Amino acid sequence: MTTISAKAVSELRKSTGAGMMDCKKALEESGGDLDGAMDYLRKKGQKVAAKRADREASEGVVAAVVEGNKGLLLSLGCETDFVAKNEAFIELTNTIAKMAFDADCKTIDDVNALEIDGTTVKERLVNETGKVGEKIEVTNLEVVEGENLASYIHAGAKIGVLVSYKDGAKDDADQFFRGVSMHIAAMKPSILHPNEFDEEFVQKETEALQAQINAENELNEKENLGKPMKNVPQFASRRQLTPEVLAATEEAIKEELKAEGKPEKIWDKIVPGKLERFIADNTLLDQERCLLSQFYALDDTKTVEAAIKEFHPEAEVVAFKRISVN
């Protein structure tokens, strides 16, 4: 049996990053040949990767790279938080993110095809899978370009956000839009404005919301829970609130005030508030999924859109991306 020296094991570990016992086993199997040992470890990684192909790489970390007018978010996935917290795993994530940024990658396939240490990223991750015994893969890639960019990585590097914005020429715009990025991390909007919704999607979500509230009200009544009955909204998105709908609603409010005997001279003070309430009650889908329609996490007395306009009338979010693991 070939005697394996500590020096040979150390050299193989340095070249591959594999564990000491794995390196020793590989050298024994290859009769002490370094190239043969590396091939052994590579094949071992392929076998482990094949066995774990159907596993979910639902843990991991997110890295952000922002330079000039471009920003990139990339997440590297693994199976457990234990591996995700490993310094080598975090360093590899940051390395791949910077490579993807420099190579102007647009898709995960682009990233996997990049060359790293004499092999491709995809092959490197197969080798990493063999080393740690967990599926490892690039799970998300997003690129945002714009004149001004803000980024935010949430504690633990589980969530990353990029925001492209117009600053209104204010010096503290970076700080303000970092706050908007933090809001996006916490509140998970999927689109910027209600107009981005598909009409059919909005209709289905409206019907689902109405059914949900009706079911909750029926349960409340049946079980005598004593909770206040919820109003069932006619609509769910600002996209549905056409000028005709708003005009009809305003007229209905005035008729209601007239029936209540409220003097007409004070209607102008009451109608705007009631109309605003109607809009809030009938845009629940927007409040859940549209950034500009959500109540601002850093000041929930106003929407994100209102907070931005209060910061500066010409400031605006142009685009944003949010990625997360687990």
From Swiss-Prot:
Q: From the Swiss-Prot or TrEMBL record, what is one GO molecular function term?
A: translation elongation factor activity
The answer, when asked if Protein biosynthesis is one of the entry's keywords, is yes
* Top-rank taxon, per record: Bacteria
UniProt cross-references to InterPro entries, sorted A to Z: EF-Ts_dimer_sf, Transl_elong_EFTs/EF1B, Transl_elong_EFTs/EF1B_dimer, Transl_elong_Ts_CS, UBA-like_sf
Alphabetic keyword roster:
Cytoplasm, Elongation factor, Protein biosynthesis
The UniProt entry's sequence similarity note says: Belongs to the EF-Ts family.
Identify the Pfam families for this entry. Answer: EF_TS
Q: Which GO terms describe its biological process?
A: translational elongation
Q: Where is this region: Involved in Mg(2+) ion dislocation from EF-Tu?
A: 80-83
Q: For this UniProt entry, what's an example GO CC term?
A: cytoplasm
Q: Is the Protein biosynthesis keyword given for this protein?
A: yes
Compartments in which it is found = Cytoplasm
The protein in question is named: Elongation factor Ts
* Purpose: Associates with the EF-Tu.GDP complex and induces the exchange of GDP to GTP. It remains bound to the aminoacyl-tRNA.EF-Tu.GTP complex up to the GTP hydrolysis stage on the ribosome.
